């Protein structure tokens, strides 16, 4: 009986020690960024599904819409976020980039490189552009009395959280002025176009964060 109590006591101590270690060991920056990007991927996919269901009369499917990339000629995510072995001339590409780069807490020291720093800076700019557009569209949607659809708050929060992790300069984001009396049909069609383009970009972002958090 005494031996059983002693073993139970040891097991309790071991469990308490394990829980204590779990509390004090911080989550690494790259792991947190991966978790945030996965959450963004999920909330974006959910928002795309919601838009397809609620805007089914607006041809809001990937097959029907006119695809438009608002980041085209503005950022270089697709070039800078290629695997390092595919970059033929890193220094040449870097000279064409702006000197202001953002990496925040997502880039681990062992994977630090000029291209990955530029990659994360470009991802940050992507998110900033989409966040600005989504805020303007959401304001326009909320101005419509029937409110057929509005953007999911979870997706907007997920964008903001990942941007905060990427933003080590503490940049204050400027919100785009709300759209005035915009045509409801045009606003909803633009929403469909943006959501599909954004969901594609989020897949790329999630892959980058997965690479950075891998051993």
From Swiss-Prot:
GO CC annotation: cell surface; cytoplasm; endoplasmic reticulum lumen; endosome lumen; extracellular region; extracellular space; Golgi lumen; interleukin-12 complex
SUPFAM superfamilies registered for this protein in UniProt = 4-helical cytokines
Q: Which UniProt keywords apply?
A: Cytokine, Disulfide bond, Glycoprotein, Growth factor, Secreted, Signal
Check the UniProt entry and state the signal peptide residues, or none. Answer: 1-22
Sugar-modified residues: 89
Disulphide-bonded residues? 33-106, 60-192, 81-119
Phenotype on deletion? Deletion mutant mice display normal development. However, they are unable to restrict the progression of Leishmania major infection with strong parasite load in lymphoid tissues observed. In addition, regulatory T-cells are functionally defective and mice are unable to control colitis (resembling inflammatory bowel disease, IBD).
Where in or outside the cell?
Answer: Secreted
Instruction: Relate the protein's function as given in its record.
Output: Heterodimerizes with IL12B to form the IL-12 cytokine or with EBI3/IL27B to form the IL-35 cytokine. IL-12 is primarily produced by professional antigen-presenting cells (APCs) such as B-cells and dendritic cells (DCs) as well as macrophages and granulocytes and regulates T-cell and natural killer-cell responses, induces the production of interferon-gamma (IFN-gamma), favors the differentiation of T-helper 1 (Th1) cells and is an important link between innate resistance and adaptive immunity.
Q: How does it assemble?
A: Heterodimer with IL12B; disulfide-linked. This heterodimer is known as interleukin IL-12. Heterodimer with EBI3/IL27B; not disulfide-linked. This heterodimer is known as interleukin IL-35. Interacts with NBR1; this interaction promotes IL-12 secretion.
- What does the similarity note say? Belongs to the IL-6 superfamily.
Q: What is this protein called?
A: Interleukin-12 subunit alpha
Task: Identify the gene encoding this protein.
Answer: Il12a
């Amino acid at each position: 009986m005494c031996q059983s109590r002693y073993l139970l006591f040891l097991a309790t101590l071991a469990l308490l020690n394990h829980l204590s270690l779990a509390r004090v060991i911080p989550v690494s920056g790259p792991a947190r960024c991966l978790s945030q990007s996965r959450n963004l991927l999920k909330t974006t996919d959910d928002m795309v599904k919601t838009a397809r269901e609620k805007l089914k009369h607006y041809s809001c499917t990937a097959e029907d819409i006119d695809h438009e990339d608002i980041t085209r000629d503005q950022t270089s995510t697709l070039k800078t976020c290629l695997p390092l072995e595919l970059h033929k001339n890193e220094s040449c590409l870097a000279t064409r980039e702006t000197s202001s780069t953002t990496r925040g807490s997502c880039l681990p020291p062992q994977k630090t490189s000029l291209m990955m720093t530029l990659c994360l800076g470009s991802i940050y700019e992507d998110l900033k552009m989409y966040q600005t557009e989504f805020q303007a569209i959401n304001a326009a949607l909320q101005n419509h009395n029937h409110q057929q659809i509005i953007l999911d708050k979870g997706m907007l929060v997920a964008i903001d959280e990942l941007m905060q992790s990427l933003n080590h300069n503490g940049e204050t984001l400027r919100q785009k002025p709300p759209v005035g009396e915009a045509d409801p049909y045009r606003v909803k069609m633009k929403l469909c176009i943006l959501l599909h383009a954004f969901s594609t970009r989020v897949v790329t972002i999630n892959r980058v964060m997965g690479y950075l958090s891998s051993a």
